[in-house]
């Protein structure tokens, strides 16, 4: 079993190249390869996570990462309690701190990495939405669909109250249509400029 002193910081943060051996001459699937995989599919990894990954094959490590429905009930309860406490303050910054805690402690890092990816893709602003509950609901929507069908995610996000507020759909009227919602959904989020 590897120890923390076995990890060389320089190679741990260098790009992993399949087929390359470790600088010390060990096999390809080692701590370096596992560290690369877990950084790419998550945010970081503990030594225990690295040891668990190298104890099996690369395919088994990937299968564990893709098992996004494997959140222990204790973690789900901890997050529910933290969310309720945060929502009680009404502070959107508290939600950001709560999410950071979740990212750092999640047993399913790929799910949070994909939630963050979709959060960046379907951008909204808490300053414009001005409702912590709506921002939380949007984050939960992104998490629910993070690893699923893009068309379903797009449909759900197009109905999301935070997104509707952010894209000015609340000011859209028959006599005075606001094209921002349709343009953003079509052009920025799915088809690209001029492809609709």
Q: Which positions does each model-derived feature cover?
A:
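N-terminal module-boundary/linker segments of secreted carbohydrate-active enzymes
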Residues: 1-94, 103-105, 109
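Primarily short, surface-exposed interaction patches in extracytoplasmic proteins
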Residues: 28, 45-63, 87-196
